[in-house]
């Protein structure tokens, strides 16, 4: 069995470092119907008080963002366009930074259940976006505030990417200089990346 990530993983690292290091890890959701899982292939870092694209910009503290001010490994779920998005808090209490999980590569043994959750969607469309992966994994707003260390959602060490690319984040226009921050991190060549071009898909993406 692969090593389950503990809170030690989050210690002495920046949010940017964590957003890169989490690529290739297995994201697991244990449900009553079975274990659903996939390898993380795309993330975005959100840098809190100084990041205009972050919900917690200027330390904005609301009912929705309250969990962002808690401890590393806490789960921040929010809704956008009727989709639910999954984030992990990264910094010590009071520093509201987070990682958005944008795409995963579904694992073969979990695909059938994940396809059912997605209404029969198959192939790359299954999990190649932040709202798609949460639906496939059966995650919901009820998971808001859970931790990765003592709940039915956790991370495991799994694979190491050959190459990681950094680009601008998706869907954050009109956010000043934050629009152009290279804070989207991807496993180069993964077919499951959001808006991935066929010409950029590689056959061998893991070490």
Swiss-Prot record:
Q: Could you tell me which SUPFAM superfamilies the record lists for this protein?
A: FMT C-terminal domain-like (SSF50486)
**Domain of life of the organism encoding this protein:** Bacteria
Set out the biological process GO terms recorded for this chain's protein. Answer: base-excision repair
- Enzyme Commission code: 3.2.2.-
Q: Does the keyword DNA repair apply?
A: yes
Q: Which InterPro entries match?
A: Formyl_transferase-like_C_sf, MPG, MPG_sf
Q: Name one GO molecular function term.
A: alkylbase DNA N-glycosylase activity
Q: Which Gene3D superfamilies match?
A: Methylpurine-DNA glycosylase (MPG)
Q: Which Pfam families match?
A: Pur_DNA_glyco (PF02245)
- Which keywords does this chain's UniProt record carry? DNA damage, DNA repair, Hydrolase
Please state which protein family the record places this protein in: Belongs to the DNA glycosylase MPG family.
**HAMAP family assigned:** 3MGH (MF_00527)
Identification of the protein by name? Putative 3-methyladenine DNA glycosylase
Organism source for this protein?
Listeria monocytogenes serotype 4a (strain HCC23)
Q: What is the lineage of its organism?
A: Bacteria, Bacillati, Bacillota, Bacilli, Bacillales
């Amino acid at each position: 069995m692969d090593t389950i990530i503990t809170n030690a993983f989050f210690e002495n690292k920046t949010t940017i470092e964590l957003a890169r290091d989490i690529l290739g890890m297995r994201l697991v959701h244990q449900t009553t119907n079975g274990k659903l899982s996939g390898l993380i292939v795309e993330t975005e870092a959100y840098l809190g008080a100084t990041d205009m694209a972050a919900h917690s910009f200027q330390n904005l503290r609301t009912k929705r963002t309250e969990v962002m001010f808690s401890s590393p490994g806490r789960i921040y779920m929010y809704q956008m366009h009727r989709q639910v998005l999954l984030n992990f808090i990264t910094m010590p209490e009071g520093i509201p930074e987070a990682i958005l999980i944008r795409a995963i590569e579904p694992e073969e043994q979990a695909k059938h259940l994940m396809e059912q959750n997605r209404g029969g969607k198959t192939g790359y469309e299954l999990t190649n976006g932040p709202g798609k992966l949460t639906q496939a994994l059966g995650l919901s707003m009820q998971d808001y505030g859970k931790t990765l260390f003592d709940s039915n959602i956790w991370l495991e060490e799994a694979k190491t990417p050959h190459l990681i690319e950094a680009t601008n984040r998706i869907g954050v226009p009109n956010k000043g200089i934050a629009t152009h921050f290279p804070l989207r991190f991807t496993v180069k060549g993964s077919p499951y990346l959001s808006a991935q071009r066929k010409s950029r898909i590689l056959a061998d993406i893991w070490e």
